[in-house]
Amino acid sequence: MRVLLAGGGTAGHINPALAIAGFIKQKKPDTEFLFVGNKGGMEETLVPQAGYNMKFIVISGFNRKLSPKGLVDNVKTVKRTITSSIDAKKIIKEFKPDICIGTGGYVSGPVIRAAAKLGVKTVIHEQNAYPGITNKMLAKEVDKVMLAVPDAKKHFDKKADFAVTGNPVRSKILTANREEARAKLGVDERPVVLSFGGSLGARKINEGVADLIARSGIDGRYQHIHAYGKYGKWFPDLLKEKGCELEKADNLDIREFINDMDVCMAAADLVICRAGAITLSEIQALGKPAILIPSPNVAENHQYHNAMALVNAGAADIIEEKDLTGRLLMQKADNMLSNPEKLAEYAKNARKTAITDANERIYSVIKGVLGLV
């Protein structure tokens, strides 16, 4: 079997493609893979690191700002759209895939559209509750649209053919154990709060969570693990300004990055984070109560819609960034952590919404489209 995967721009589009490829490889080791990505995107590093062959096209989105620069950018985008379609057709004809899989991002547009026009079987995977513009445009042209959550269906053309598969979740997350994780981290029976804003860090989350962490550093009521990110190196100084001495607070674990997220999340009683699709899938799989602070700086405000899918299921609480203050976050955290019954209800509802067999479902869809079932 020959499989071509197209997706990129952010890790949220690349990691699902890598997870899908990894599972297919596990099931059919003789499968040949080719990834197509955008030159300069994160996929340029992540895909070769995972051991897959890769080819590139150049594509960009339209600049929506009415300015001279925006006009110049849009002229370039039109040219790139034409050349990327030509390049995509050439790559597909040379590789001769049995199926093309798109996981979102601008790059998947010309590749999946070209494949469909050439008569190649095509499927796309949408990670978010509110779909990206590329996947919305492709939905009518592909053989199957795979959705992470049922809520996404209402935002697509009704004529598309859907399958709810969930998002691929790493096996480390699925097998993580709370007691083992807490023992590994050396935490006691006090509540554990886990907070993070992504690898680069989120200034608003760092500022918002500082009061909660500083108070725990002073009165010891919670154990707190927080990652401030690449651009948050000022965070320890902010805690110091608030009267928290990190070197004396053994209940605080303040880091730049979290490299053992499976352990930290398994140990947590409450998670405070953004609402990226893959992170939420991990929260659901582990049944973790969460306070979600969606990033407003994402396409189609999709993180808000991701968060609301969990909020509406009674599995999480939400604070929009414009409303975020240290006091409000402390109030919500205290309200949840002081109410074991409420915490258990959130956890139960999170698990109810989880799809832990996403890889198997996706593989089943692929086999069905290829007529291998």
Spans of features found by a protein language model:
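Glycosyltransferases and closely related glycan-assembly transferases
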Residues: 87-100, 107-123, 136, 140
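A short, well-ordered alpha-helix in the C-terminal region of glycosyltransferases
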Residues: 342-356
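Donor-nucleotide binding loops and adjacent catalytic segments primarily
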Residues: 46, 178-183, 187-271, 304-308, ...
